[in-house]
Amino acid sequence: MGACISFFSSSSPSKTGLHSHATTNNHSNGTEFSSTTGATTNSSVGQQSQFSDISTGIISDSGKLLESPNLKVYNFLDLKTATKNFKPDSMLGQGGFGKVYRGWVDATTLAPSRVGSGMIVAIKRLNSESVQGFAEWRSEVNFLGMLSHRNLVKLLGYCREDKELLLVYEFMPKGSLESHLFRRNDPFPWDLRIKIVIGAARGLAFLHSLQREVIYRDFKASNILLDSNYDAKLSDFGLAKLGPADEKSHVTTRIMGTYGYAAPEYMATGHLYVKSDVFAFGVVLLEIMTGLTAHNTKRPRGQESLVDWLRPELSNKHRVKQIMDKGIKGQYTTKVATEMARITLSCIEPDPKNRPHMKEVVEVLEHIQGLNVVPNRSSTKQAVANSSRSSPHHYRYKAGALGAERKRATPGRFGSVEK
């Protein structure tokens, strides 16, 4: 039988209803930490919404917190049909907690359809034996089922049947920012880089603007997905948390995330602030400036962390020119590079109190985008044309072996399952 999730409960609104008890398996080299104990496998889920203490219907920056979830409940047979029985040639990618397949559904009813008929969707089939897989599935349904914004990926439906856990998303044909940014010998044009981070910033600003803020906790280039127009949408809410309540400054939680992006205060103490997301956003800004990955153990000692390595260079406008990606030379002005360095440096401030709010970041980036008037944009136009010819898969969310610096490599998560 398929399962329908109860988002609301009459129990105390101070609890989230998320309970996972697990031991920790530690892995090195930035791969995911997982657990194998204690997952609930009943065919129905009765749990309180994480949004039970947020005012419903809040509209902010063209987004809203929905009064009730609008998700289609699929049975397992539906999704077997939509993916040709999960055949290997339908698989888009895989990770530590499951695999993602290309599927087909009716564009109007979202009912499963024959391959090649209707619209393409992305179907994530999670590993039901993993407690973390179950926790992430539940978190995605809770958050993406209740949040609507043009810069958040749309969750269309879900399935929980026996031990099967699946999620159905809109398909993002242009892949992820990561899949474009770190391609070898094919630099991604500056105009698209700035457009994409502005869209991502708007999505993050929306999460932070809710009456009870949502902390995304896993902001990184591989989680910024792109539609056919290169409009950015945040994906993967498996680690998202509600922000602090009752005028507290932070929430305390087990340390989970991705090396190179996690804020220093969170790594040191487990204290998670709304502005911990701002730090991660600053890391992505540094990535689009340099074309280098946030964390790479193949780099020389002292350069593994992009932030630790290049933070000192950002305050010197002459050095900023030296760290900019050589592949996009001529596509931006000196003023643009200097202003980008300034907002990036502000975002990666060691003290979260000194970081800007994401709404301010959006305004600054929009201003910078308007500054970028270069004499000759022919190289940019050609680069955009080259990018448009390729649509790399973006669902390979497991860390792989790192090769050369510009070789595509998704950083893996660290951390243990949360209680």
UniProtKB/Swiss-Prot annotation:
Catalytic reaction annotation: L-seryl-[protein] + ATP = O-phospho-L-seryl-[protein] + ADP + H(+); L-threonyl-[protein] + ATP = O-phospho-L-threonyl-[protein] + ADP + H(+)
Membrane disposition: Lipid-anchor
Residues the entry annotates as binding ATP: 92-100, 124
The organism's taxonomic lineage, starting at the top: Eukaryota, Viridiplantae, Streptophyta, Embryophyta, Tracheophyta
Enzyme class label: transferase
Region (Disordered): 8-48, 378-419
Covalent lipidation (S-palmitoyl cysteine), chain numbering: 4
EC numbers on record: 2.7.11.1
Phosphothreonine sites (modified residues): 253, 258
Primary localization: membrane
Protein name (record): Probable serine/threonine-protein kinase CST
UniProt entry keywords in alphabetical sequence: ATP-binding, Cell membrane, Kinase, Lipoprotein, Membrane, Myristate, Nucleotide-binding, Nucleus, Palmitate, Phosphoprotein, Serine/threonine-protein kinase, Transferase
Domain (Protein kinase) ranges: 86-368
Subunit structure: Interacts with SOBIR1/EVR and RLK5/HAE.
Function, as annotated: Acts as a spatial inhibitor of signaling that modulates abscission zone cell adhesion and expansion. Acts both directly and indirectly by physically interacting with RLK5/HAE and SOBIR1/EVR at the cell surface.
Lipidation sites (N-myristoyl glycine): 2
Composition skew (Polar residues), residue ranges: 15-48, 378-390
Name of the gene encoding the protein in the UniProt record: CST
Native source species: Arabidopsis thaliana
Modified residues (Phosphoserine): 117, 222
GO biological process: negative regulation of floral organ abscission
Keyword Coiled coil: no
Superkingdom of source: Eukaryota
PTM section of the record: Autophosphorylated on serine, threonine and tyrosine residues.
Protein family: Belongs to the protein kinase superfamily. Ser/Thr protein kinase family.
Keyword Kinase: yes
SUPFAM superfamilies: Protein kinase-like (PK-like)
